[in-house]
């Protein structure tokens, strides 16, 4: 698979409890063709986070890669938005 043809997704981190792995949810909103109602569909991905910088609540970008384990087939590209509630000023 060429590096340029790999899929890139954006989603929210919902869990960071595993070592070097985060769970990300990607929400897709589609309009129902028959009734016209907007329907939300979500999908979970396991993403490899080598540096363990992504935390729960962050908005991240990740891309498809070779299989890293039975369930991990994506790796972290960048953290788009970081929710820094833990920092004290």
Swiss-Prot record:
Q: Which UniProt keywords apply?
A: Ribonucleoprotein, Ribosomal protein, RNA-binding, rRNA-binding
Report quaternary structure and partners: Part of the 30S ribosomal subunit.
Query: GO MF annotations for this entry?
Result: rRNA binding; structural constituent of ribosome
InterPro entries for this protein? NA-bd_OB-fold, Ribosomal_uS17, Ribosomal_uS17_bact/chlr
Q: Which GO terms describe its cellular component?
A: cytosolic small ribosomal subunit
Matching NCBIfam families: PRK05610.1, uS17_bact
Per its database record, what is this protein's job?
One of the primary rRNA binding proteins, it binds specifically to the 5'-end of 16S ribosomal RNA.
Quote the PANTHER family the UniProt record gives: 40S RIBOSOMAL PROTEIN S11 FAMILY MEMBER (PTHR10744), SMALL RIBOSOMAL SUBUNIT PROTEIN US17M (PTHR10744:SF1)
Similarity remark: Belongs to the universal ribosomal protein uS17 family.
Q: Where does the source fall among the domains of life? A: Bacteria
> Does the UniProt entry include the keyword Repressor?
no
Tell me the GO BP annotations in alphabetical order.
translation
Q: What is this protein called?
A: Small ribosomal subunit protein uS17
């Amino acid at each position: 698979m060429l590096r340029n043809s790999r899929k890139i997704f954006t989603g929210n981190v919902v869990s960071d409890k595993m070592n070097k792995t985060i769970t990300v949810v990607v929400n897709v909103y589609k309009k129902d063709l028959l009734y016209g109602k907007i329907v939300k569909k979500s999908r979970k991905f396991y993403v490899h986070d080598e540096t363990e910088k992504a935390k729960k609540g962050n908005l991240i970008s990740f891309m498809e890669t070779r299989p890293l384990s039975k369930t991990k087939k994506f790796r972290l590209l960048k953290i788009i938005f970081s929710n820094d509630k833990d920092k004290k000023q």
